[in-house]
């Protein structure tokens, strides 16, 4: 069983507070660790969690405001200091390459490992990275500058109907693996058995979405529903009484995030990117006031710095 965890390294907005660092979210999927946004001080936050900078091979930047990128220079320098050799892939909107190039000019450093930067220019949802068992989709959002939400989608292989394969005379052993991988084999009678004869549709894979900073976008919610999104991490910078401030600054409120989650039909919504104007208790009380009117069936969680979630146990269970 693949281990999937979310670790919130920072959950604050433009200005950090005593309780909330600048934004940064780590997602563990098996042996992979993905970092979504990298605000100031993120590498120190990692020291209090199970996240190792050396295990991060992919960084996804939603947009180029400082609270989402100012942790990159220090993180890269620490990776170099500890002798990293493996390539690091960084994805982000137009201008990301220049940010990374400038980061490498700051001070004396030991960065000798390869860094590959992928800039995103799309105005439509598009797969920006794909492996055998997952893909990452970028979805354009609205925040005044080029910005993207990111969607992690697990890819499941078709299942093998072993009993049917036996009845068709397939040898138990390597031939079953070949069929599962899409290769035809010969049965004990010398007949060709094609994969489609014995393969069942794959089970639905896990799907996670992170909004980044954005105005509420109904089309985003509808798109996530089409994908079968399970968990949505959505910014909720302001409470519902500050709708004008949210709109003016191109952010979302608690209610906005809940509405998008409802459209997406998710199992869990995690609110993050919370303004420093609220202390921890105040935001929680406003949240309770705001969500009373919604009475939704999905879980709603307020993110906290250094809090981790086992996705299957804590969010989908």
From Swiss-Prot:
<protein>
    <recommendedName>
        <fullName>Ribonuclease Z</fullName>
        <ecNumber>3.1.26.11</ecNumber>
    </recommendedName>
</protein>
<feature type="binding site">
    <location>
        <position position="213"/>
    </location>
    <ligand>
        <name>Zn(2+) 2</name>
    </ligand>
</feature>
<keyword id="KW-0378">Hydrolase</keyword>
<keyword id="KW-0862">Zinc</keyword>
<feature type="active site" description="Proton acceptor">
    <location>
        <position position="67"/>
    </location>
</feature>
<dbReference type="InterPro" id="IPR001279">
    <property type="entry name" value="Metallo-B-lactamas"/>
</dbReference>
<keyword id="KW-0479">Metal-binding</keyword>
<dbReference type="InterPro" id="IPR013471">
    <property type="entry name" value="RNase_Z/BN"/>
</dbReference>
<dbReference type="GO" id="GO:0042781">
    <property type="term" value="F:3'-tRNA processing endoribonuclease activity"/>
</dbReference>
<dbReference type="InterPro" id="IPR036866">
    <property type="entry name" value="RibonucZ/Hydroxyglut_hydro"/>
</dbReference>
<keyword id="KW-0540">Nuclease</keyword>
<feature type="binding site">
    <location>
        <position position="67"/>
    </location>
    <ligand>
        <name>Zn(2+) 2</name>
    </ligand>
</feature>
<feature type="binding site">
    <location>
        <position position="143"/>
    </location>
    <ligand>
        <name>Zn(2+) 1</name>
    </ligand>
</feature>
<comment type="similarity">
    <text>Belongs to the RNase Z family.</text>
</comment>
<feature type="binding site">
    <location>
        <position position="213"/>
    </location>
    <ligand>
        <name>Zn(2+) 1</name>
    </ligand>
</feature>
<dbReference type="Pfam" id="PF12706">
    <property type="entry name" value="Lactamase_B_2"/>
</dbReference>
<feature type="binding site">
    <location>
        <position position="68"/>
    </location>
    <ligand>
        <name>Zn(2+) 2</name>
    </ligand>
</feature>
<feature type="binding site">
    <location>
        <position position="65"/>
    </location>
    <ligand>
        <name>Zn(2+) 1</name>
    </ligand>
</feature>
<keyword id="KW-0255">Endonuclease</keyword>
<keyword id="KW-0819">tRNA processing</keyword>
<dbReference type="GO" id="GO:0008270">
    <property type="term" value="F:zinc ion binding"/>
</dbReference>
<comment type="function">
    <text>Zinc phosphodiesterase, which displays some tRNA 3'-processing endonuclease activity. Probably involved in tRNA maturation, by removing a 3'-trailer from precursor tRNA.</text>
</comment>
<feature type="binding site">
    <location>
        <position position="273"/>
    </location>
    <ligand>
        <name>Zn(2+) 2</name>
    </ligand>
</feature>
<feature type="binding site">
    <location>
        <position position="63"/>
    </location>
    <ligand>
        <name>Zn(2+) 1</name>
    </ligand>
</feature>
<comment type="subunit">
    <text>Homodimer.</text>
</comment>
């Amino acid at each position: 069983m693949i281990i999937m965890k979310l670790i919130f390294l920072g959950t604050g907005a433009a200005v950090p507070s005593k309780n909330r660092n600048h934004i940064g979210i780590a997602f563990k999927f098996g042996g992979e660790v993905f970092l979504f946004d990298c605000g100031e001080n993120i590498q120190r936050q990692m020291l209090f969690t199970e996240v190792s900078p050396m295990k991060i091979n992919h960084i996804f930047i939603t947009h180029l405001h400082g609270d989402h990128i100012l942790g990159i220079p220090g993180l890269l320098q620490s990776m170099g200091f500890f002798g990293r050799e493996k390539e690091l892939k960084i994805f982000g909107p137009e201008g990301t390459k220049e940010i990374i190039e400038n980061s490498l000019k700051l001070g004396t450093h030991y960065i000798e490992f390869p860094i590959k930067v992928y800039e995103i220019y799309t105005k439509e949802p598009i797969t920006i990275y794909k492996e055998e068992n997952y893909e990452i989709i970028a979805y354009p959002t609205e925040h005044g500058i080029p910005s993207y939400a990111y969607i992690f989608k697990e890819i499941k292989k078709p299942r093998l109907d072993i009993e049917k394969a036996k009845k068709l005379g397939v040898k138990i052993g390597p031939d079953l693996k070949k069929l599962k991988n899409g290769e035809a084999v010969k049965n004990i009678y010398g007949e060709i058995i094609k994969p489609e004869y014995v393969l069942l549709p794959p089970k639905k894979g896990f799907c996670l979405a992170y909004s980044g900073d954005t105005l509420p976008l109904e089309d985003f919610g509808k798109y996530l529903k089409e994908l079968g999104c399970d968990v949505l991490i959505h910014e909720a910078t302001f409470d519902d009484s500050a709708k004008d401030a949210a709109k003016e600054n191109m952010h979302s409120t608690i209610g906005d995030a809940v509405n998008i989650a409802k459209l997406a039909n998710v199992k869990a919504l995690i609110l993050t990117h919370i303004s420093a104007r609220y202390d921890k208790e105040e935001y929680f009380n406003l949240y309770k006031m705001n969500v009373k009117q919604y009475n939704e069936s999905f879980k709603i969680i307020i993110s906290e710095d250094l809090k981790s979630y086992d996705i299957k146990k804590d969010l989908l269970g």
